[in-house]
Amino acid sequence: MIIIPDIHGRTFWKEPVSKALETGESIIFLGDYVDPYEYEGIPKGGLVPMLERIIGIKREHPGQVTLLLGNHDLHYLDENLGGSRYDYSRAVFYVRLFRDNSELFQMAAEAEIGGQKFLFTHAGVKRGWLDFEDDYLGKLAPEDVCSRLNEMWLDKEQRPALLDILADISTSRWGAQPYGSPVWNDIEDMADDADELPDYYQIFGHSQQEENPVIGEHFACLDCRRAFRINDKGSIQEL
């Protein structure tokens, strides 16, 4: 399985995705496709075509490619999820692409590789957040988290409630809630390396690292501008 962490307009994903499409290896994008960092000097003119291409890849290979959503994607659908670097000049295009192709995206994914269960989200899942928002989510066992988040996303009647609780931001990200959501949770909130969801190893991005990924006992934060692979034994390797 190939893992593509936060893109933000970068091109590092293209070669590993192209190779994986040829070999049939599964691919998962962890979200945050747009809103590049100004200091990286990424031309914004190519971002809409890039997002269109990624969506096209998903349409062409629906069973092979998984597209997760991050906070920089969702804030084009709900202003309460607003974050930095919102691109007002291209917002109308992003809104259309995310809204009109919403069924191609999801909030979470899971897989079992090498005897290990993996849960993929944009920013990680805290047990405390699941309990904090159980009025909306219901009482969830670890094995129900992925399906419940995706159910709420794909059901247009439940989606507004999901977007409301996804706007939860903890103090680690200058928010006011006791827990961050799976698109806003900060790596500091996971820093104790607690086993938040027993039996699941969590993989996420969102918290950009200067150089190397953070790979712990119970989670891996891979937001470091490179692609990764989970091999058949369940080990994470940089590509």
Residue ranges of predicted features:
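Active-site neighborhood of phospho(di)ester-bond hydrolases with catalytic His/Asp-centered motifs
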Residues: I4-P5, I27-G31, T66-N71, F120-T121, ...
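Active-site-proximal loop/helix segment associated with metal-binding centers of metalloenzymes
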Residues: E112-A194
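Catalytic core of PPM/PP2C metal-dependent serine/threonine phosphatase domains
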Residues: F98-G114
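Core catalytic region of metal-dependent phosphoesterases/phosphodiesterases
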Residues: I4, G9-D100
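Conserved beta-sheet core of the metallophosphoesterase superfamily
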Residues: V183-L239
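Active-site environment of divalent metal-dependent phosphoester hydrolases
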Residues: G9-W13, D35-Y37, H72-D78, K126-G128, ...
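Short coil/turn segments at beta-strand junctions that form active-site/ligand-binding loops
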Residues: T23-E25, G63-Q64, F105, G115-K117, ...
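Beta-strand-turn-beta hairpins that frame and shape the catalytic cleft
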Residues: M1-I2, E110-L119, G216-E217
